[in-house]
Amino acid sequence: MAFVSAWFLLGGLGHFVFTDFFVGIVPPYVPWPLAAVWVSGVFELLGAAALLVPAWRRLAACGLFILTLCMTPANLYMWQHPDLFPSFPPTLLAARLALQAFLLGCILALMLARDEAPLARR
């Protein structure tokens, strides 16, 4: 859970610190790329925080799973058009896709995890 929360905290902040980069990887068929970057950044930050609240963890994981699926086209776009991203070696672009699959698996595990047993009352 800490890995997923940290991933989305850093990624969400990145949407605002490196906005131009993230806008640049939005596929051309996605309308309003700047808005898409800002909105996804906000949802990443909200999801990262919500994962830390046990009562919200499963809902946050569901939201982050859907968000990650929605962002997959950006990673696919980079992988399919390496000439547009010459500073990224093709192997790194492929590794990003593998990492995204791993991340989806981690999020799915959070969605399916049983809730921790509540503390016994005294």
Enumerate the predicted regions with their spans.
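Membrane-interface extramembranous regions
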Residues: M1-R122
